[in-house]
Each structure stands twice: as C-alpha cells, then as structure tokens.
Amino acid sequence: MCIRDSKQKERVEELRLRVMHPLTVLTLEGELNAAPDGRASLVTAEDLEQMLGAVTEYSRYACIETLRQGFLPLRGGFRLGVCGSAVVRDGEVSNLKDISSLALRIVCEHIGLGSNIAPQLFSADGRFLSTLILSPPGGGKTTLLRDLIRVLSLGDAEHRALRVAVIDERCELAVCCKGRAQMELGNHTDVLSLCPKAVGIPMVLRGMNPQVIAVDEITAEEDIRAMCLAANCGVGLLASIHAASVDELHQKPLWRELLRARVFRRCIVIRSNGGARSYEVGDLPCSD
C-alpha cells in the first residue's frame, strides 16, 4: 500500500526513515509506502546523519539531554525519535551513535476535541473529578489529553478556569522548544518539561499551587505513589495509560495497584474503528 490521495496525507502521523529501507508513513490505517509507485529509493546512513545534523543545527552536544533519551523536540511541535547504537556509561545511556532509524512525529493538535468531553468530568457541584484516559499505543491519548488540558485551563460558562500543572516528561504535550510551548494548553497552564513524573509532581505541588496535575503515560510504581501524594493534597489528576479497556487494567499488577489507590474517579476509553475514533466516558471502578 502507499499514500495516494489528499485524505490519506491529512491522516499521516509519522514519517519513518530506516537505513537501507524506503521511506514509509504511519497513518491510522497502518504503515504505508510513501512512494506512489511503491518504488521509493532506499534511505542511507548519510541521509539520517544529514537530517539529524539539520534539526540539531549541527550541534548535537546542545541536544544531548534529550538525544540520549531517544528523541528531539523540534520547532513547530514536531518530535524526532532516534534509534542507533547506545553509548552506555555507568549503567546509563550517555549518547547515541551509528544512527539507524528516525521517526518524525507530526503532532496532532485538535483544538476543540475535548470541549464536549470535559463537562462530563465534573461532579454535580462543579468539582473536577480525576480522570484516566485509556487506549492502545497510537490510539490518540496524547491528543485528547492535550486538548482537555487546554479546556480545563481556559474554563467555560459552566466551569471556572483551573490552574493546571503539566509534567511533560517526554515533551509530547506542550512540545516545548527552548522554553516555549509549541502547543496550545490554555492561559492557566504551567509546564515542567523533561522531568520524570515521580520527581516533577512533588516539585509543582511545592512551587506552583496547581488545582490539576496532568501527566502522559503512567508506567511505573513511583508514578502512582507521586499521584497518590497529589490526590492526598486535594489536587485533581488528569493522566493517560496504555490499555484498551477497563478490564485490561485489572490484568496487570501495576494497573491493579493504580485502581486500588482510588485516585481516579472517571475514565475515558478511546476506541478506533475503521480510522474513526470514539470516546466513552464513565466511572472508573476501584479494585479490591
């Protein structure tokens, strides 16, 4: 398969470049050949080095903190994933060399996506109810999370604006570049970039007096402990997790621990069908 029409081009989410393979594009329908005739020329190692040099302005050292984590945030909200040979020192990745793959992520900013969903995340007396967003990888969690942050931060006729602190560990929500957010997150949002969630949550609790803390992709026990700390301080939580359903949350120990913590009241399950996405909002049951 390949990209042939304008509608397919609009649904492109990533460009994938791999040494000695043709350029491909990732869409909701899957990974497709970029060339109309299916005969794209092969990507070379020199192509990848040239692209990496251009996006780092030929100063990799200035970008080493994110590069060693496997990505680079770029101007305009783009994000470049990087694979190659890891240089490991004292048990930590200090650099990447012999670059073999690049993935240019085209960040999807869907302003208004969360407008009809956000009102369902409040109690009858107007309190925000901590909410967990669920979908498989690539299911649109980050896009929805980003717009819900914007909606909560701006407020509306029914709900006042809330102070939202975003722990943007991998620069996927605000996509900050040189301290400036490339995405629209609202007027009352504070962003802490490139900081582990377990470290960043206590930091913003101490320093920024948030009413809501937003994080992307809960992956570790320390993340859950930090969110429990925030919940015990009376702060609302907005987060996402890789899971296709609430039932799947009960199947893995880490997620069962999350349910037992009872810090989330609402859940949003994102489902994809034939390239279209639907959003199901409901109460999040607790685990015994």
What are these regions (language model features)?
Residues 1-6:
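Conserved small/polar residues in nucleotide/adenosyl-binding loops
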Residues 60-127:
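P-loop NTP-binding catalytic core
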Residues 89-98, 265-288:
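Conserved P-loop NTPase
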Residues 133:
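Hydrophobic anchor at the beta1->P-loop junction of P-loop NTPases
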Residues 141:
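Conserved lysine of the Walker
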Residues 144, 148:
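Hydrophobic positions on the alpha1 helix immediately C-terminal to the Walker A/P-loop
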Residues 153-202:
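P-loop NTPase switch/communication element
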Residues 208-272:
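Conserved P-loop NTPase nucleotide-binding/switch module
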